[in-house]
Amino acid sequence: MNSPVAVITGASQGLGLALATELAARGWSLVVDARDADRLARATSTLPGGPHPAVAGDVTDPVHRRELVEVAAELGGASLLVNNASTLGASPLPAFADLDPATYRRLLEVNLVAPLALTAGLLPQLRRRSGVVLNISSDAAVEAYETWGGYGSAKAGLDHASRVLAAEEPRLRVYTVDPGDMRTQMHQDAFPGEDISDRPEPESVVPALRRLLADRPPSGRYRAADLRAVAS
């Protein structure tokens, strides 16, 4: 039997790598992406099983997205897409009044446009397998935190687009997940100079994501903390 195939963006570190490690250990074949080719190669070299093609590039690049789609097809077709790659933009985060339009455009391209475009490219594969689209969101998508307007509005757009996709593709499962605070470089960039050593490791979120994939509840928005509470 062929292994199920997952495409995971932003998989060289943090939550992307933690989930990739878990899925690889459970027999999945992975197509993983990140911008830093060397870091991605080091990360994927630790993954069990395989094959796990590492495709370095920027998710905002249409050529790179097509390559991800083609590599997934070569492995047999994707059953799961995890849109995890993300950016905060400037660090420290600026107020809306100080948000440069070019920076905001980049936030939208990475956090909203690229996930939607990659999803569209993989839809034929996902439809054939009644697959899953897992979009990593944030509480900033629903809460009005000062200086988080650029990132939060991009993630809010992703949340709503996910709801529309779920309505249009009822055979798929389309999830947005708020993972909560994590001890990641991205979180450190959001709070430069702050000690974040008390934040949970990304690996602590993986059981919640695994529960979604195993149980296939209705499409929707979920908080990792709630999923963990149900599991326990």
For each predicted feature, which ranges?
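Conserved NAD(P)H cofactor-binding loop of Rossmann-fold oxidoreductase domains
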Residues: 84-92
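Substrate-binding pocket helix/loop in short-chain dehydrogenase/reductase
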Residues: 92-96, 100-105
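Active-site helix of classical SDR
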Residues: 119, 154
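Residue(s) in the substrate-gating loop at a strand-loop-helix junction
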Residues: 138
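C-terminal helical subdomain
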Residues: 171-172, 176-179, 184, 192-232
